[in-house]
Amino acid sequence: VQAATNTSQVNSNNLINPKLEAEVLQIIHNHPEVVVEALQAFQQQQQKQQQQAKQSVLQEIKTNPNKIIGESPTTGATEPKILLIEFSDFQCPYCAKAHKTLKQFMARHQDEVTLVYKHFPLISIHSEAMPAAKAAWAAQQQGKFWEYQDALFAQQNKLGDKLYVAIAKKLNLDLEQFNQQRSGNAADAVIQKDIETAMRLGIQGTPFFVMNEETFDGAVELSDIERILAKNSKKNLSNLDLAPRPEYALN
């Protein structure tokens, strides 16, 4: 009886006063601009918050880059002047194209640029994006991220568990350790942290890049990255004080 009474009270509390509802609907009918203005105000507030979050990340890249880098794989200059952060998805065809361009770019600027890889698997459209990211992270724990990354992009049309194990064998990884780590909670935590950083930047697709404080996206051409590098090289980068980091060469 008590339960029935409580349910009745809840339902009663949830009921909308018909008179009040009619008045509200009449106001909306007579003044539709009120709804439009409210929506616009909400959108502006959302955009403001997103912009603030983005600027916070960009400022952090400038003042405390090692915090942004964290334990992400890096290649290139160990004492860099230019920081290039890549957000990528192993199942994204545009990322595979950008990967080839980045290899050419880094071959030219190994002593000047530090490339940082961040995972941003688009799981809503790419079913193998997350498993591939976990496999790459597990390979990183054995010092083979960049080689593993190359293999994933080179065989993007074959993504799946069979390929992940085959690449691990080819790179002479400890398979037991590899399989344990790619299925463990640590991989999820690291990738989720990268995703959160991407969301703060307002990233909606891949590939996405940040060079120092400048952002750009898509399957960029080599000439585009060179132009952005030239622009950033002219800036005063005295605040970009990175501690030396282990280097993994791009093959």
Language model segments and positions:
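A short beta-strand-turn-helix
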Residues: 65-82, 107
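N-terminal targeting signals for export/organelle localization
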Residues: 1-63, 245-251
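Structural alpha/beta surface segment adjacent to cysteine/selenocysteine redox centers
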Residues: 85, 90-91, 96-169, 173-174, ...
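Soluble periplasmic/extracytoplasmic beta-strand elements of cell-envelope proteins
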Residues: 25, 38, 83-86, 114-118, ...
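Short amphipathic alpha-helical/adjacent loop interface patches that line ligand
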Residues: 32, 99, 195
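Soluble non-cytosolic domains of exported or imported proteins
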Residues: 14-18, 22, 29, 93-96, ...
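C-terminal cap of thioredoxin/glutaredoxin-like
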Residues: 5, 12-21, 25, 169-251
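Short amphipathic alpha-helical surface patches that mediate protein-protein
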Residues: 29, 40-43, 153-157, 169, ...
